[in-house]
Amino acid sequence: MSQNDLIKTIRMNYLFDFYQALLTKKQRNYLELFYLQDYSLSEIANTFDVSRQAVYDNIRRTGDLVEDYEEKLGLYRNFEQRQNLYEQIKQHINDPEQIKKYIQALEDLD
């Protein structure tokens, strides 16, 4: 697995966590098996008795859909920003002025 594939898989796992409630059961099943359980297209196709192409198309369309949700709702983007601010707070724990700045930035995200 290349570095880009790994980054995409991690991103899709996060997007799946945030947006799975907005997906159909079939979409959830395919994405979960492919990205979280690391099933191959053939294994998913055999499990659901469909073609590999059908699985591929569904995963691609569903991936595009969760990316669209992220573009509109930004749940993952906000999560990443919060995580970065938490790390900054940890690094500046002995600097009250910096802490206030980061807390304000956290509040501004809401």
UniProtKB/Swiss-Prot annotation:
Transmembrane segments: none annotated. Might take part in the signal recognition particle (SRP) pathway. This is inferred from the conservation of its genetic proximity to ftsY/ffh. May be a regulatory protein. PANTHER family: UPF0122 PROTEIN CBO2450/CLC_2298 (PTHR40083), UPF0122 PROTEIN YLXM (PTHR40083:SF1). It comes from the Bacteria. Belongs to the UPF0122 family. Disulfide bonds: none annotated. This is UPF0122 protein SSP1533.
